Amino acid sequence: MYATPIGYADTRFETAADAPRQGVETPYAANVQVYESFRGGLVGLEPDDRVVVVWWADDADRDVLAVRDGDRGVFTTRSPARPNPVCITPCELLAVDAADGTLAIRGVDMAHGSPVLDLKPALD
């Protein structure tokens, strides 16, 4: 398997422990910085769109299979602590600057520097 980050999260949360459990639980705005080689993919994104940020929880514990003292398996949760910490966060798109690759978003739950793997339109 091979995946290349398209950018990274620029947030106020220095660690995963600082971030909210779910993006919908926070009003905080943040940025996604898209690397130059991927900025052509931003064409057509508009403020007020809803996007799903697909990101990698690079500081997550990858040895976890059960949560809450073992009463539930990790695959029944949205926890980033899991064998493959791929995370999805629906966000409100506040602004797009395709020239410098900056997306301003609201509803973030990722730590600063988290690799962003993809952006997808959110479905209602």
From Swiss-Prot:
Keywords: S-adenosyl-L-methionine. It comes from Halobacterium salinarum (strain ATCC 700922 / JCM 11081 / NRC-1) (Halobacterium halobium). Residues 3-124 form the TsaA-like domain. The keyword Nucleus does not apply. This is Probable S-adenosyl-L-methionine-binding protein VNG_1115H. Belongs to the tRNA methyltransferase O family. It comes from the Archaea. The keyword Transcription does not apply. Coiled coil: none annotated. SUPFAM superfamilies: YaeB-like (SSF118196). S-adenosyl-L-methionine binds at residues 20-22, 58-59, 78, 111-114. InterPro entries: TrmO-like_N, UPF0066_cons_site, YaeB-like, YaeB-like_sf, YaeB_N_sf. Disulfide bonds: none annotated.
